[in-house]
């Protein structure tokens, strides 16, 4: 049964005010379905921004209440279609530098602090980067990103210069591929050099909420991540930023992260599901219920109606329910293989996407 909660600032959820205005009755669980429709219509017709309290109330729908969850999923899908249409965006990445990362992110196979047996190598050549970029472009990807391990590019001019050379080289030898970059904590000056090299989007996840982040990483702060996002936006880069579900956070933490992303005006939100890596502190984390993941995705669509919600690493954890994500808010995906885990083929993803009526 759904229960009333007090908001952070005191008082009751708007849900109860809505019910009082409607019939002056005490809230009953059966009315949740009507409230979902009420919120959906306000978002579509009034460009309404839902509150933290409303989002948390939606999160209380039990994971086994399929009737109510399907109403939530359908509402999220309608919001997606109104604000984003049927276009589905596909991006790809290459692990361009692997291992020996100085940071202690507890989920990561590439941290020097943990013994995971991951591959270790330096920055790849521009020729290999171009080969992978062209292969992905030919298979139908819209975007391609180099991803490098390490804290960031601050104070690493040699690596920055090499990356600039690689991005320019890819840009000169591809036609439609949009270039993205993921290189950790960066100054405006370093990011401007990436812009000048042809990079259009910078990826830098928040990973979790401000409250929970110290449980994930202590070698840099949540504000370090936010400042890098602000630096990227300041030099004209689009920003791709999201997080990982299954780190041990609560669903309220996921909602708080989404609200921070909304405040930062992020329009591409990667949604990862933890793949526990042996040797990391999170190797024994419990898996999140697939329907809780789908419920969270739907709530993200209510919070960020205009954004690309992007399936990324770990979506295989959803199993047969992964396709449902494309009917409850997802409208983009990282396709192909991920950094240190196996993904899906571009062709397989394209087939599924088209079967569900999207345009690529």
From Swiss-Prot:
Pathway note: Cofactor biosynthesis; biotin biosynthesis; biotin from 7,8-diaminononanoate: step 2/2
GO biological processes: biotin biosynthetic process
Cofactor or coenzyme needed: [4Fe-4S] cluster; [2Fe-2S] cluster
Coiled coil: none
Binding-site residues, [2Fe-2S] cluster: 145, 180, 240, 310
Domain of life, source organism: Bacteria
Enzyme class: transferase
Subunit structure: Homodimer.
Known function: Catalyzes the conversion of dethiobiotin (DTB) to biotin by the insertion of a sulfur atom into dethiobiotin via a radical-based mechanism.
Name assigned to this protein: Biotin synthase
Gene (UniProt): bioB
């Amino acid at each position: 049964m759904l229960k009333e909660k007090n908001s952070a600032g005191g008082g009751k959820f708007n849900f109860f005010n809505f019910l009082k205005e409607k019939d002056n009755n005490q809230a009953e669980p059966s009315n949740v379905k009507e409230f979902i429709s009420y919120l959906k219509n306000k978002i579509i017709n009034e460009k309404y921004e839902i509150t933290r309290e409303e989002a948390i109330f939606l999160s209380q729908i039990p994971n086994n209440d399929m009737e109510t969850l399907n109403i939530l999923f359908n509402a999220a899908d309608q919001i997606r279609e109104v604000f984003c249409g049927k276009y589905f965006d596909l991006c790809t990445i290459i692990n361009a530098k692997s291992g020996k990362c100085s940071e202690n992110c507890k989920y990561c196979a590439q941290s020097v602090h943990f013994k995971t047996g991951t591959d270790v190598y330096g920055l790849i050549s521009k020729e290999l980067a171009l080969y992978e970029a062209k292969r992905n472009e030919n298979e139908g990807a819209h975007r391609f990103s180099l991803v490098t391990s390490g804290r960031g590019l601050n104070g690493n001019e040699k690596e920055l210069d090499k990356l600039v050379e690689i991005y320019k080289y890819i840009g000169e030898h591809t036609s439609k591929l949009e270039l993205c970059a993921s290189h950790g904590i960066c100054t405006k000056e370093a990011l401007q050099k990436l812009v000048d090299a042809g990079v259009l989007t910078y990826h830098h996840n928040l990973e979790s909420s401000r409250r929970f982040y110290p449980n994930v990483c202590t070698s840099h702060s949540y504000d370090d991540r936010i400042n890098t996002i602000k630096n990227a936006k300041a030099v004209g880069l689009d920003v791709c930023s999201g997080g990982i579900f299954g780190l041990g956070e609560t669903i309220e933490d996921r909602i708080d992260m989404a609200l921070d992303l909304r405040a930062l005006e992020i329009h591409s939100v990667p949604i990862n599901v933890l793949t526990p890596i042996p040797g990391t502190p999170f190797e024994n984390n419990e898996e999140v219920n697939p329907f809780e993941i789908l419920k969270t995705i739907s709530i993200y669509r209510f919070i960020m109606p205009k954004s690309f919600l992007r399936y990324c690493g770990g979506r295989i954890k959803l199993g047969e329910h992964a396709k449902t994500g494309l009917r409850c808010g997802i409208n983009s995906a990282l396709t192909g293989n991920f950094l240190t885990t196996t993904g899906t083929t571009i062709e397989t993803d394209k087939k599924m996407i088209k079967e569900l009526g999207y345009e690529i």
